[in-house]
A protein has these predicted regions:
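Conserved SAM-binding loop of SAM-dependent methyltransferases across substrates and taxa
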Residues: 109-122, 192
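C-terminal substrate-binding/active-site "lid" region of AdoMet-derived donor-dependent transferases
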Residues: 184-255
């Protein structure tokens, strides 16, 4: 659990009256300046999370610890990071559970890696591949700055297009999660290292990428319940009796494709997010396993 008070060396956010966030890494003796307004880091260190602080010139701001979503949007990046709206969906639709063994590629700036680590918990394991040294370095710094030492992360400078290796214990992965330009090239490797009943998930931004990914899943002959979707996030303005959608929204960012590894020879599309029956009118499956005639 984090300390109740802001600590020296911690990365915090200062938030102004318009809701704009400014990232600050606290360092005793330093001075923070914003548009001519100043505040000593010493005046922020040991403040309670959520305190109102006053900069020179009388400018008031909130000093808060960033949420995970805040941190992702403000952290240094090499590769483009996933938006929080997509990061929030991935642990749910990939069914990432405490104790799961997850393979990820590519690491990028580390946002998805952190989301997976938070979901698997200390008893789980995340193995992540990143081919580019500069991206791997940025991701490592971002992860350490936000999460500290993470002993259940195995970060390797490998190219997933060339293959996926199990760890020395030979235990297959429960989940495979890909954020790569050409995930269809990795589908055969994922089929080999994913346990039966395990879940495959990939994120891509365009329709042609989705088409090639789903075609590869079908060709592999061991994936079923395949589903592709996107999510659109729209905030609302609520000011007294004036309630309306905001003029701007985070619309299309990419597509998530999810599939289950199953016994070879069965192919099916997934169910709709609303439930197992398309129109909601079908009777639930019999628990005793008897067929209806």
């Amino acid at each position: 659990m984090p300390h109740a008070r802001l600590q020296n060396g911690e990365r915090i956010h200062l938030v102004d009256a318009k809701g704009r966030h400014y990232a600050v890494t606290l360092k005793a003796g330093d001075l923070y300046q914003l548009s001519g307004h100043k505040i000593a880091h010493d005046a922020l260190i040991d403040k309670v999370d959520g305190s109102i602080v006053t900069l020179s010139g009388g400018k008031s701001m909130l000093a808060v610890r960033p949420t995970f979503g805040d941190y992702v949007l403000k952290m240094p990046r090499g590769a483009q990071v996933l938006y929080p709206k997509d990061l929030a969906l991935i642990p749910m639709w990939a069914d990432i559970y405490p104790g799961a063994r997850v393979f990820e590629a590519g690491t990028g700036s580390g946002a998805l890696t952190m989301a997976l680590l938070r979901a698997v918990g200390p008893r789980g394991l995340v193995v992540t591949y990143e081919a580019r040294e500069d991206f791997a370095r940025t991701a490592r710094l971002n992860i350490e700055r936000y999460m500290g030492a993470v002993p259940n992360l195995v970060a390797l400078r490998n190219n997933a297009y060339e293959g996926i290796q199990l760890l020395e214990d030979g235990v297959p992965f429960d989940r495979v999660v890909l954020d790569l330009p050409e995930p269809w090239q990795v589908v055969p490797h994922a089929a080999r290292v994913l346990r039966s009943g395990g879940i495959y998930l990939s994120f891509v931004p365009t329709v042609p990428q989705v088409q090639q990914t789903v075609a590869a899943l079908q060709h592999a002959a061991v994936f079923a319940m395949v589903e592709t979707f996107e999510t659109l996030l729209r905030t609302w303005s609520v000011q007294g009796r004036s309630v309306r959608p905001d003029h701007r929204m985070v619309a299309h960012s990419g597509f998530l494709t999810v599939a289950r590894k199953v016994e070879s020879g069965f192919w099916s599309r997934g169910t709709t997010p609303s439930g197992p029956e398309e129109d909601g009118s079908a009777e639930p499956a019999e628990e005793n396993g008897k067929d209806e005639t």
